[in-house]
Structure formats: C-alpha cells, structure tokens
C-alpha cells in the first residue's frame, strides 16, 4: 500500500536527518527521495505526516520560521510525547516571528498534553518566557512557580526560581 511504500522510501531520509545531512534529508540524494518528495508523492499517509514533523524541525533549525510553521501545523500524532514536541517547536517558531499569542498557546498545549518530569518543565519554562515577552508578568510568575513546586528535580528548577524572584522583585516596585 501507499503508506508502506512511503515509509520504505523515507528510511534513507531519516538516516540523513540523524546524520545531520539536512540537505539530503530534505531533498534526497538523487537516488532516494527526501522528506519533501515523500510529502508531495504520498500525501495523507502516515509517512507524509511524519515527514512534516522532520521538515518543520529542519526549517526551524535553519531559522526559516514561516515554512517551519506550515509543516509543523500539518503534523499530528497520537503519541503524546511526539505531539508535545511538535507543539513546543511551533511555540519556538511563533515566538521567533513575534506571534506571542500563538507561541503561548502552543507552549500551553506542549506542557499540558501529557505531563512528565523530563519534558514538562522545559515546556513550562518556554511558556513562562513567552509570557514575559508578552508582558504577562503574573502568568510568568505563576508558571515559574509551577516549575518550582512540581519539578524541583528538573534542570529548569534553579533558573525558574531565579526568574520568579526577579519578576516578583520587579512587580513589587
């Protein structure tokens, strides 16, 4: 079927992606198709859906935010961890383009879709930063506080405490 064929053809593109051969991952190597061809030749397959995720993450890393948003918006997953990552990447792209409302919305989705001690604090931290940039100081304080209360073993804990204290100090003036 179409999906199995697309997945077989996408194998090499995934390999290139994992090896940081981004150009080959996107456009193929002349023998094997890249992610862009998979999306074009096999639309509405699971493989094309996954290719959208890879393409979006590549474009984001290349600071091509508009295309990153377009491809990531076309991706959806049943796996909560992968979908949360896609929401976080969308948040990053929207933050970079100055669309703070959409950045906040996507970071909220990333942080709340399936809480876990490794990724949720990262997504909450990004959400708090977006709140700060949007001038929503109380929401930022509250979000940093959530990291402080629930994720005290996380990498983000110390920075969240520091930023929360800084914002509380500014708010008190």
Language model features by range: what are they?
Residues 39-48, 62, 76-84, 111-120, ...:
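Short solvent-exposed coil/turn linkers within tandem alpha-helical repeat scaffolds
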